[in-house]
């Protein structure tokens, strides 16, 4: 779009334009101003992308000032060591729990305005210094009048309107990019990514969804206790009578987040395997899972149990996607490559003709050549997964759908954990 704006000088614009004729002069001041604002938004997006991809540290304060969408996208990039340096990923991962905080006087005001009636009657002590801060809210320690230690999460501000506005603007930019490069829609679809981010972030902005999500995951755990027990998993106790859309009261969990365990190198490989076993049961066995299980959203408590927190973003994976991926990984772990490639064909609406099947399997064989001989540090699983998805879509007609993105994203999270903690591990142990 031409970005013309009036500076009191004839024909000053961002772009190539000859002197305006009489028709050009019919643009209203509003239209010129809107064009200018769109150019500013585009330049802001380009600056954001440069902050993410440039060598050296990103300006985290600047990113946070761009709003909730910028923070959420940065958190996704933080789990892409195949795209960014390990050092850059580690820096961006600070945004999981070390976001900007609310001044203490504003926290008090929010609680007085937003907390349920009778809230203060149950609080014996409240720490004005935040225990942790994330993109949506921040957490403070407190003690109830009955002596129980809790944490109180407070939504930082009314993010919803600006967040949805930013998403719509980004959608317009992505549609333009897709019109120029249609393959973007088929593989690593940025529109699917944005819709996924919009969906789970919108749910995060209503803290009641954390109680609902935690209860749903705990119910699934109970239903699987006979066939697939998960004794190392638990969920925090919530206090629904003291919570609402803006304020959440839950148990104070003594322990360390996975992020803290990574930083002090205290996360053994066998513990990661147990976490993957648990998360995999939800993703592949049930298809309902924690959709934002980054290293800041899982605590290892004093009893060595995994405690899933921030349970507001519960995702559903299409059964044909989750089951096909499970069979793919199972056969791959047995070095049955042809059977693994065959399993992925289940994601296609109908089986492609034999020429396409042969082409698909040939390309997959190239991707997975020497797979079992390489370590995670030598070959990113995320990179392999992206190439696999691309080949499945282009050569086999697979359709992961927008609903399939959360499970791919969860696999990216797990890959990032392994790369940061045990890069020497073989892809097939």
Spell out what each predicted region is.
Residues 290:
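Histidine-centered phosphotransfer motif of kinases
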Residues 1-280, 287, 295, 299-323, ...:
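Broad phosphate/nucleotide-binding scaffolds in NTP-utilizing and phosphate-metabolizing enzymes
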């Amino acid at each position: 779009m031409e970005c013309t704006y009036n500076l009191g000088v004839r024909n000053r614009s961002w772009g190539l334009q000859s002197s305006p004729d009489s028709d050009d002069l019919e643009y209203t001041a509003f239209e010129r101003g809107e064009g200018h604002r769109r150019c500013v938004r585009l330049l802001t997006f380009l600056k954001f992308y440069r902050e993410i991809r440039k060598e050296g540290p990103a300006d985290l304060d600047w990113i946070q000032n761009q709003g909730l969408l910028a923070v959420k996208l940065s958190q996704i990039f933080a789990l892409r060591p195949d795209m960014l340096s390990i050092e850059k990923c580690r820096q961006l991962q600070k945004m999981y729990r070390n976001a900007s905080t609310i001044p203490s006087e504003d926290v008090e005001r929010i609680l007085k305005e937003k907390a349920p009636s009778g809230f203060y009657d149950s609080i014996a002590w409240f720490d004005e210094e935040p225990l942790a801060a994330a993109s949506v809210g921040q957490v403070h320690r407190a003690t109830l009048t009955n002596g129980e230690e809790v944490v109180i999460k407070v939504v930082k501000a009314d993010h919803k309107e600006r967040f949805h506005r930013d998403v719509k603007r980004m959608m317009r930019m992505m549609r333009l990019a897709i019109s120029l490069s249609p393959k973007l829609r088929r593989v690593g679809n940025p529109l699917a990514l944005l819709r996924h981010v919009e969906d789970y972030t919108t749910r995060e902005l209503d803290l009641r969804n954390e109680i609902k999500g935690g209860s749903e995951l705990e119910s699934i755990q109970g239903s699987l206790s006979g066939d697939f027990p998960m004794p190392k998993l638990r969920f925090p106790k919530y206090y629904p009578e003291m919570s609402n859309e803006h304020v959440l009261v839950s148990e104070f969990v003594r322990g360390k987040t996975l992020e803290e365990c990574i930083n002090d190198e205290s996360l053994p490989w066998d513990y990661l395997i147990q976490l993957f076993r648990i998360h995999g049961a939800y993703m592949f066995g049930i298809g309902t899972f924690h959709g934002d299980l980054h290293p800041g959203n899982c605590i290892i408590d004093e009893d060595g149990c995994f405690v899933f927190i921030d349970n507001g973003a519960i995702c559903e994976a299409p059964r044909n996607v989750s089951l096909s991926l499970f069979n793919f990984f199972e056969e791959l772990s047995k070095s049955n490559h042809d059977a693994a490639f065959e399993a992925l064909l289940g994601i296609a609406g109908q089986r492609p003709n034999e020429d396409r099947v042969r082409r698909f399997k040939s390309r997959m064989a190239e991707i997975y050549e020497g797979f079992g001989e390489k370590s995670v540090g030598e070959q990113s699983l995320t990179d392999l997964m992206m190439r696999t998805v691309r080949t499945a879509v282009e050569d086999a007609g697979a359709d992961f759908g927008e609903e399939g993105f959360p499970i791919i994203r969860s696999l990216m999270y797990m890959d990032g954990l392994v790369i940061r903690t045990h890069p020497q591990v073989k892809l097939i142990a």
